[in-house]
Amino acid sequence: MITHISPLGSMDMLSQLEVDMLKRTASSDLYQLFRNCSLAVLNSGSLTDNSKELLSRFENFDINVLRRERGVKLELINPPEEAFVDGRIIRALQANLFAVLRDILFVYGQIHNTVRFPNLNLDNSVHITNLVFSILRNARALHVGEAPNMVVCWGGHSINENEYLYARRVGNQLGLRELNICTGCGPGAMEAPMKGAAVGHAQQRYKDSRFIGMTEPSIIAAEPPNPLVNELIIMPDIEKRLEAFVRIAHGIIIFPGGVGTAEELLYLLGILMNPANKDQVLPLILTGPKESADYFRVLDEFVVHTLGENARRHYRIIIDDAAEVARQMKKSMPLVKENRRDTGDAYSFNWSMRIAPDLQMPFEPSHENMANLKLYPDQPVEVLAADLRRAFSGIVAGNVKEVGIRAIEEFGPYKINGDKEIMRRMDDLLQGFVAQHRMKLPGSAYIPCYEICT
């Protein structure tokens, strides 16, 4: 099957040089990146969390960029049949395909165009933040003048039905209060709040629904965008993805999840516990149904015993009360607005949030890097939080990212070393994730990609 797709969404014009950049060549990493992300988009809504399995299932899929005088078209060769209805591509997928093209081309151009950006230094914290801003601005995700109303929702892709229905109820309550949603774009706790908010917005006749899906090339195939996403944004790596979340958020809700959710919480606490951010207003709520109370108790104990009692003041745990979660978020929006106005910061992008370089620099989850993490208590808590975040990030890679899966197949499990008490609590937390099926989607046995060494 070969079909041609016209542009829809936020990109409809490419220069001739940009098209040539994406022309298929056997050695083109850029083409492979574009192809794999496009395939993930066309599998939107599919229940998989194994990027290697998805990519191998569609080995005969190809995509070409065709240059036309009036713009550009995409040629799809052997695409997934589920992306089409009566021979026509689903419009949301059509828009998301061009979002992939937009973001991958833009990031490549920003990084490699030394004429337009001669001084871009990706080892410089300020430059990294400006790149994150540029990607979001190019995606038209930063709406000037809009009052704060963007709630970022984090949580696992592999959650049980009770947790899914609860996250949907929270989303409905947020939607009834005309709040918009940003998630990691995949299934589970990333889809449920959007689904609930869509109903809430419809009930209120709210016409400006924004369901932002923020992803990255290395995970999009393991977590294909859910069908509710109407603004897909692809950040270059997990660190820039996390920074984008935090800088566009006016409030953050964390639902039950696995190692990826723990990584997100530790990343955020590493920022909020930095003394430079003591005046920031960013409400953070951890919530789930009553069946998840034990999950949050264990997570809370892990945070307190590794980062100290002071970490607790940066978040609130609300169990089994969807309306209260939404009320607290809505009540916080004027406070966020006042804080941004008082500091002269933008409503759409939090420039004043201080993010330490060790939270911004990409972490390569190699076996050597994982073994060399400094997981000891005799250091500033924000530094320990950053290394704990890296440890969980490596486990995410070993679980679902193609590069991590291949490394585990070749060299065996990651070995994680550190303080005996921290290692014991980390092992308890991870064993709980395994027992509760939070590492993999139900139906597939989980084989640990790590060993805790004490």
Swiss-Prot record:
* Gene3D superfamilies with a match to the protein in the record: 3.40.50.450, MoCo carrier protein-like
Gene Ontology CC annotation, any one: protein-containing complex
- Please state the Enzyme Commission number of this protein: 3.2.2.-, 3.2.2.10, 3.2.2.4
TM segments? none
The family database entries (SUPFAM superfamilies) matched by this protein are listed as: MCP/YpsA-like (SSF102405)
What is catalyzed by this enzyme? a pyrimidine ribonucleoside 5'-phosphate + H2O = a pyrimidine nucleobase + D-ribose 5-phosphate; AMP + H2O = adenine + D-ribose 5-phosphate; GMP + H2O = guanine + D-ribose 5-phosphate; CMP + H2O = cytosine + D-ribose 5-phosphate
- GO BP annotation list: protein homotetramerization
Is Hydrolase included in the keywords of this UniProt record? Answer: yes
Q: Which GO terms describe its molecular function?
A: AMP nucleosidase activity; guanosine tetraphosphate binding; identical protein binding; inosinate nucleosidase activity; pyrimidine-5'-nucleotide nucleosidase activity
**What happens in the null mutant?**
Cells lacking this gene show a reduced growth rate and yield in glucose minimal medium compared to wild-type. They also show a consistent change in the level of several metabolites whose masses can correspond to adenine, xanthine or 4-hydroxy-L-threonine.
Keywords associated with the record: Hydrolase
Homology family: Belongs to the LOG family.
Q: What does this protein do?
A: Catalyzes the hydrolysis of the N-glycosidic bond of diverse pyrimidine and purine nucleotide 5'-monophosphates, to form ribose 5-phosphate and the corresponding free base. Can use AMP, GMP, IMP, CMP, dTMP and UMP as substrates. Cannot catalyze the reverse reactions. Is required for optimal growth in glucose minimal medium, possibly because it contributes to nucleoside pool homeostasis by degrading excess nucleotides and feeding back the ribose moiety to catabolism.
PANTHER family documented for this protein: CYTOKININ RIBOSIDE 5'-MONOPHOSPHATE PHOSPHORIBOHYDROLASE, PYRIMIDINE_PURINE NUCLEOTIDE 5'-MONOPHOSPHATE NUCLEOSIDASE
What is the protein's name according to its record? Answer: Pyrimidine/purine nucleotide 5'-monophosphate nucleosidase
